[in-house]
Amino acid sequence: MWELVALLLLTLAYLFWPKRRCPGAKYPKSLLSLPLVGSLPFLPRHGHMHNNFFKLQKKYGPIYSVRMGTKTTVIVGHHQLAKEVLIKKGKDFSGRPQMATLDIASNNRKGIAFADSGAHWQLHRRLAMATFALFKDGDQKLEKIICQEISTLCDMLATHNGQSIDISFPVFVAVTNVISLICFNTSYKNGDPELNVIQNYNEGIIDNLSKDSLVDLVPWLKIFPNKTLEKLKSHVKIRNDLLNKILENYKEKFRSDSITNMLDTLMQAKMNSDNGNAGPDQDSELLSDNHILTTIGDIFGAGVETTTSVVKWTLAFLLHNPQVKKKLYEEIDQNVGFSRTPTISDRNRLLLLEATIREVLRLRPVAPMLIPHKANVDSSIGEFAVDKGTEVIINLWALHHNEKEWHQPDQFMPERFLNPAGTQLISPSVSYLPFGAGPRSCIGEILARQELFLIMAWLLQRFDLEVPDDGQLPSLEGIPKVVFLIDSFKVKIKVRQAWREAQAEGST
């Protein structure tokens, strides 16, 4: 009996002990590792993972490896090495590792965000980027769409004049409508129950993707019941059912001679492929309804929660730093005034606001650790070998909080992005990648930057944004999920007297 147990343990140890493919190669320094559990017993048990990995750099250097369950993962925490992974060797490291939770969220590795590199990922990324090009000019200009939704947002907030409210849902509605217009040319009215459905499944997917699921680290655990996976499947099904309903309804009104949104772009690509009018890289099988709705789901998931979260982080930092907020009001008043609403061209004038947004993205990046990459081939990072199939994580938190790159990195200092005179935006460090880089960079970066600037400019022009009467400031600790969330908080909304007077003058 004991001989069999010993044999089983030795077999498991052999199967799950990390192996080197190139005996003479130099690999990154590694944390201690045990069979089956890997380095898990030796990782810090408290605190945010991105910060714990950052602290481990002091002992192991800017690149090191950990054995996460049965997988070897390389952690990269320096901008030069990160750019090598993302840009210089972007093709080598453009893969996505297979993980149980990501497979569920991506309908078995479809879409863009969690799909492995290959023909389907390249095709859908290219089509998504082509869609954003539709919104450069004319009636569909991105700025026009964003501003019409912000106008509705501001009108709604004005009805809460003098009240302390959580602005999460109002901002969520505005950002959701922008994405919906880009994807379907439709938007939701306030009170539409579908908005709550979208918010609930978004939150459910983000929450369950981010839980410390052993099944992602030890894949064979999938054979056992798993509450996290079941909850994730439930939320993904709700998302898929909703998007499938939208897709089926849209098919009836699709016109191939009028391509105006993302769904049009994807459906036209499928039609061309079915008719033999597409290139060899545009296989019809890669444009099934399931592929299409997963890509739309990715755009919704990435575009809504990220922007909403950054707006809330920005407001939170301004409530904590009233002196910066005061300067922003002065900048708005002097450069925009109250006779017109802010436009994207005001980015050249509202430099402190732009610097503030950049500083928020540095201090609280949307994703403190980028979605894991995977080595598609045997490659290297710096002087170290990286075997094919190895998972690579870019610790963006480490890049953005490196004391050698940033003066007082934990302090909120928007002025670091301005020259001493405050008349020009600057790049104080190359260790700054808020939207990633290379083949896997965020395709919605332009949209996100426009939304963040315009939302904040409009809010600051119209409202005094104050700490509630109870004096409760937002927590800046954060909740690290797939997106770095902030705890719910309230802000006191007061319509600015100068704005009110300007509107009264304009109506006479």
From Swiss-Prot:
Which PROSITE patterns does the UniProt entry name for this protein?
A: CYTOCHROME_P450 (PS00086)
**UniProt keyword annotations, A-Z:** Congenital adrenal hyperplasia, Disease variant, Endoplasmic reticulum, Heme, Iron, Lipid metabolism, Lyase, Membrane, Metal-binding, Microsome, Monooxygenase, Oxidoreductase, Phosphoprotein, Steroidogenesis
Q: List the disulfide bonds.
A: none
Q: Which ranges form a coiled coil? A: none
Q: How is it modified after translation?
A: Phosphorylation is necessary for 17,20-lyase, but not for 17-alpha-hydroxylase activity.
Q: In which pathway does it act?
A: Steroid hormone biosynthesis; Steroid biosynthesis; glucocorticoid biosynthesis
Q: What is its EC number?
A: 1.14.14.19, 1.14.14.32
Cofactor(s) this protein cannot do without: heme
Identify the residues that bind substrate: N202
Query: What protein name does the entry list?
Result: Steroid 17-alpha-hydroxylase/17,20 lyase
